[in-house]
Amino acid sequence: MADSKVTTASLQALLDAFNAHDVNAVMSFFTEDCVFDMPRGPAPGGRRLTGRQQVREGIQSRFDGIPDIEYADDRHWTCGDRGVSEWTIRGTQRTGEHVEVRGCDLFEFTDGKISRKDSFWKIIE
C-alpha cells in the first residue's frame, strides 16, 4: 500500500490477502502500532490485540483454527481515514464444525495503513 489514500480497492486487496491465508501480505496493510479488536473475548469489546506481533499472532491463529476459512459476499466502503468491509466467513474448524457467519470490520487508517481494525460477527443461535 504505497499510496496513502485508502480506497475500496485497498480493502478488497486486504480481503484477497486474507483469502490467500498470507499472513505477511495481510500484515503489510497494518501500521506498527496497530490495534485489532477481535469479535470474541473476555470484555464487551472483544479481545484486544495491540502491535504488529500480537495482531500477526491473532490472524495466524484464525488461519490455524479454520484452515479453509474464506471471506465472501463482500462489500467495502471508505470515507477519509475510515473504512468498512462487510463479508461472510465460511470454513471448517479443526473440530470439524462448519462455520458460516456474517460480519463486518470497521477500519481506521493512518498514512494509508490500518491503525485499528474492529471486527463484528453475527451470533447464530
Regions found by a protein language model. Give the residues of each.
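A short hydrophobic beta-strand element
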Residues: G80-I89
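Short solvent-exposed loop/turn micro-motifs enriched in small/polar/acidic residues
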Residues: A9, D68-E70, V99-V101
